Amino acid sequence: MDPCDCAKTGACNCGATCKCTNCQCKTCKKSCCPCCPSGCSKCASGCVCKDNSCGSSCCQ
């Protein structure tokens, strides 16, 4: 089950506390967004959320 409605609302809930906005993706992972808002670093795994924002070093 998809934990977010980013395809509908444009917001991804990543993990328990982080929320990515302006998403264009259709699915979300539990700890990563496969889409990143402008200003977030991007990589193959998406953007890793740290605290309440998207981490700048996301590749793991």
UniProtKB/Swiss-Prot annotation:
Residues 1-28 are annotated as: Beta. The keyword Magnesium does not apply. This is Metallothionein B. A divalent metal cation 1 binds at C4, C6, C20, C23. A divalent metal cation 7 binds at C49, C54, C58, C59. The gene is mtb. Belongs to the metallothionein superfamily. Type 1 family. The keyword Cytoplasm does not apply. InterPro entries: Metalthion_dom_sf (IPR017854), Metalthion_dom_sf_vert (IPR023587), Metalthion_vert (IPR000006), Metalthion_vert_metal_BS (IPR018064). Keywords: Metal-binding, Metal-thiolate cluster. Residues 29-60 are annotated as: Alpha. A divalent metal cation 2 binds at C6, C12, C14, C25. Pfam families: Metallothio. It comes from Carassius cuvieri. Metallothioneins have a high content of cysteine residues that bind various heavy metals.
